[in-house]
Design a protein with these regions (language model features):
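S-adenosylmethionine-dependent methyltransferases
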Residues: 1-223
């Protein structure tokens, strides 16, 4: 499997800084991220910055609610990750990876299939004064056997990707790796086999959600 580790100096850092704005997720005010300007849809952001995004949806440009909830839970329950090897699966902006690093994880990897996302992860990690390894991989086939805990937020938007992610995450859980997920209850989220731990309400981006306020839940995924 080909892996590419990204660093914030990999040529896209300056364009990313110009295109994005620094903001803090509602549930994680202690974390700063480079995100799309408020009120700008993903499509509008992609069309405005084709040199950065290409044809891929810039999922990394939003602090999605499931990731916010899971990151908040990790920050409030640091013992879950302290001293452990953590993987942020489908990392996007790197919010979960950064939360794990801030909570004392021994080693953190942020995995995403979009090379721009992994560059963003590295940029955001540097901005928050934490170290993570950001890698571009095929997240539906990648191996995470060197992890103690896998974090995953908002992977259940699109049917094919959601089903592949669920199969892989359940397989990881079956191998003894703890899998913590966060989601707002989208249609492709498994309806069983999740031990819910907490829920959070937060303002939603009305361009991305169907209501002004959403409830996101965090839980352990069973095999």
């Amino acid at each position: 499997m080909k892996r590419q580790t990204q660093h914030p100096s990999d040529g896209v850092a300056e364009p990313l800084r110009s295109a994005t704005r620094t903001s803090s997720p509602h549930l994680c005010p202690e974390i700063s991220l480079r995100l799309a300007p408020a009120g700008l849809s993903l499509d509008a952001f992609r069309l405005a910055h084709p040199d950065i995004c290409g044809a891929a949806p810039p999922y990394w440009a939003v602090a999605w609610p499931g990731g916010q909830g899971a990151a908040r839970y990790v920050l409030d329950h640091a013992a879950l990750v302290a001293g452990r090897r953590v993987v942020d699966f489908g990392a996007g902006s790197g919010l979960l990876a950064i939360a794990a690093a801030m909570a004392g994880a021994a080693h953190v990897r942020a995995l995403d299939r979009d090379p721009v996302a992994t560059a963003v992860c590295a940029l955001n990690a540097r901005m928050n004064a934490v170290f993570i390894e950001a890698e571009t991989v095929n997240i539906t086939t990648t191996e995470t056997a060197d992890a103690d805990i896998v974090l995953a937020g908002d992977l259940w938007y699109e049917r094919m990707d959601a089903r592949q992610a669920t199969r892989l995450l359940r397989s990881l859980a079956g191998s003894g790796i703890a899998v913590l997920i966060g989601d707002v209850g989208r249609s492709e989220l498994p309806r069983s086999g999740i031990d819910w731990l907490a829920s959070y309400r937060l303002p939603a981006d009305e361009g991305l959600e169907r209501s002004a306020v959403v409830e996101t839940r965090v839980g352990w995924l069973a095999p």
